[in-house]
Structures are given as structure tokens and as C-alpha cells.
Amino acid sequence: MAAAAAEQQQQGFRPLDEASLVAYIKATPALAARLGGRLDALTIKEVGDGNLNFVYIVLSDAGSLVIKQALPYIRLVGDSWPMSRERAYFEASALQKHRALCPDHVPEVYHFDRAMSLIGMRYIEPPHIILRKGLVAGVEYPLLAEHMADYMAKTLFFTSLLYNSTTDHKKGVAQYCDNVEMSRLTEQVVFSDPYRVAKYNRCTSPFLDNDAAAVREDAELKLEIAELKSMFIERAQAFLHGDLHTSSIMVTPDSTQVIDPEFAFYGPMGYDIGAFLGNLILAYFSQDGHADQANDRKAYKKWILKTIEDSWNFFHKKFVELWNKHKDGNGEAYLPPIYNSSELLSLVQKKYMTSLFHDSLGFGSAKMIRRIVGIAHVEDFESIEDASKRASCERRALNCAKAILKGRRQFESIEQVIVHVQSFDRD
């Protein structure tokens, strides 16, 4: 431990606490300027409720910002699980890249210090809250589906071979290959550990012990998850956020901001889309655990289902519109001299989007399963105090996810998926 700490100091890294953070800000003009230069009465709050990092909100009477520092281990576990600090570089660059493509929904980066693994960025001010917390509280966000569809369509289309030359695409892939440690973490916790006995797996025991064992013994499920894992590892389709769940999104009724892309890499588009949709389905199944006499949550559950439906349909529409607009550009996936009629292009688009839809359903289901029988669970369920009630909600979600994952190619529309989800919403 001491040797590791000494090596980090030689590299210019030191974990900041509130006192040393103030000194760091004073010595960094790009950050001091955001606080109006008034640095003698700062309010600092550590809010890192994630699994990996320290996150500080810094307020002065003239400005605000957020400081995020990556630690050399997984915060959720401790220094027994080391983790590269370079993830901060990939997060900062991903925020900058995605903001250039979708400025309405990605916060600005003010400062990045690679040696310190530190990002200074916009403080996404109240009344913004983490979307997952809003879903637990039963808050409706009327623009969420359209905003997320816009974000996903732009970030995925403009970083794919539908828009870019092979040369430019390969350069992007090469830049983010070094974020392999984060991708390997995903491989382990999403595609491997839930399907075997693993040290950090947990479930709502004893209620779900048999359910977790059934996942580990399900041969058909393992065949399907192996296919998804291969796609995740091998298919550099577009530049992904890499962790696009409902705790990576901050919202108000009229604003949506996507944060925390430290898992960013080039991978299958369906992984981002599925992460978002799968977490909405988890939120749906959790609602009965949050219902009370004042609010049975039935109307809210309908809103969640409508949001899932709209998110895919808006995304499909926006993505194909971008494709049509740029079909004669530099993209090398479908060269205009070959796909030279509207009829042929329409056939290509239908096949492409159907495949993407099925990928999204598969990855979304995998993300649901890992949140119930794997390492990192979600507040949607964890905040249900009655363990028996929590397990009942989780079991419905788990059974739904397994069925969608196995049968994803049978679905022809998101509306069919919604009907399928509802069929599992009973004991």
C-alpha cells in the first residue's frame, strides 16, 4: 500500500479532500474563474454516491462547478479491487466529444488534469436531480424520451461508419482502446459474474436464492449472453457512453443532462440504447414497492411504459432522418454508388434498424439481470424496505428480462415489448 501511494505521488497524483481541493482550485485559473475569483468562503459538498469516484460540488457566491476525481480502485469495494485512473481521461474526452455532437444534453468541461485524474465541469444546478431518484419518487419528465432519443441518435450516428470514413472511424477506435480496463469490468459484472458463483454477487436473500441459482443453471440464457458478450467485445459500431443508466442522467421536467461517461468506448450501439431502456423497465417493476395509500403508482407505471415506447420510436425516427440527410456524405458503410435507389436504401435501413432493435433488447435485458443477481444493485429496488416486497418486484423484472433476452428476435416493435413487459407484472 505504502509503495503504491509513493508511486502515485511521483506521478503527480494525490487524492484531494476538502482542504486540499480549495488549494488546488486557487492554483488553477480555469477553475478559480468559474467561481468568480471569490475563494475564501467556498461551500464544498462531497456527493459521490457512485461506485468509483470522489465527486465534489463547489459553490461560491459568484459561481459553481463540480470536481470529479478518479481513484486508483473501485470505491464500492475498496483498494482490494484496483482500477486505472486513466478512466478520468476517457471520461473528460468523451464529455467533450459528446457535447460537440449534442450540446443541449451534455455538460461543459472546464478543466482536465490528467496527472491528478481530475475533471472540473459544470455544476448541473437544482432543481436537476439524478433521474433514478426522480423515478423512485414518481416524478414525470415529459421531455425525457425526446431528449434521450436526440442524445442517442446524434452521439451514435455521428460516430458510426454511416457518417465517417473507415480511416476516421479507426482513429476513434484506436483512441479509446486504452479504456480496456473499464470495458473488462463491464465484461465481468454484466456478462460473466451473474452466470456463475462470484465473490461480489448478491441478491435479496433468501427470497431470490433459487432465482439466482436458476440464472446460473440456464443453458439457453448462457448461449444468448455469450453472443451478446462477443458483440460487446468485438463490434466497434459507434462511440458509446458505456454506462447509460438512469443514474447517469440528470433531469428537470424540461432539461436532460447526460453525465459520467467514464466507460466510453467504441462498441455496439444497442448497448447504450439497451442500458437506458432496461433501466426504465427496472423502474417500472419497482413501482409496486413504492406504492402507498396516497398513490398506487398505476398512472406512473403507464407513464414509464409510454416513455420506453416513445424513447425507441423517437430514436428510430431521428436516427433514420440523420441517415437520410447524410446518405451522400463520407460514411463508408453503405456507399451511394452501390445503394443507389431509395428503395434499396429503405431496405438497408429496415434491416439495420431491426438488428439494432434486437441488440438493444438483448443488452437491456442483460443490464437488468446484473442489477438483480450481480454486484451493483439499483436504488429503484434497494429503497424498498420490505425485503419480501422488494424480492417480488425484482423477481418479476428478472423473469421479464430472461424472457426478452431469449426471445428478442421475435419482437417486431417496441409496442410488442411493452405488452410483454406488462404480462410479467403480476405475482
Swiss-Prot record:
Q: Which UniProt keywords apply?
A: Amino-acid biosynthesis, ATP-binding, Kinase, Methionine biosynthesis, Nucleotide-binding, Transferase
Catalytic activity field:
5-(methylsulfanyl)-D-ribose + ATP = 5-(methylsulfanyl)-alpha-D-ribose 1-phosphate + ADP + H(+)
Main EC class the enzyme belongs to = transferase
One GO term under biological process is: L-methionine salvage from methylthioadenosine
Q: So where does substrate get bound?
A: 51, 243, 370
Pathway field: Amino-acid biosynthesis; L-methionine biosynthesis via salvage pathway; S-methyl-5-thio-alpha-D-ribose 1-phosphate from S-methyl-5'-thioadenosine (hydrolase route): step 2/2
Which residues of this UniProt protein bind ATP? Answer: 49-53, 68, 122-124, 260-262
* Pfam families, per database record: APH
Which EC numbers characterise this protein's activity in its record?
Answer: 2.7.1.100
Look up the domain of life of the source. Eukaryota
Q: Which InterPro entries match?
A: Aminoglycoside_PTrfase (IPR002575), Kinase-like_dom_sf (IPR011009), Methylthioribose_kinase (IPR009212)
Fetch the NCBIfam families from UniProt: MTRK (TIGR01767)
Q: How does it assemble?
A: Homodimer.
- What family does this chain come from, according to its entry? Belongs to the methylthioribose kinase family.
Q: What is this protein called?
A: Methylthioribose kinase 2
Species whose genome carries this gene: Oryza sativa subsp. japonica
Q: Could you tell me the gene encoding this protein?
A: MTK2
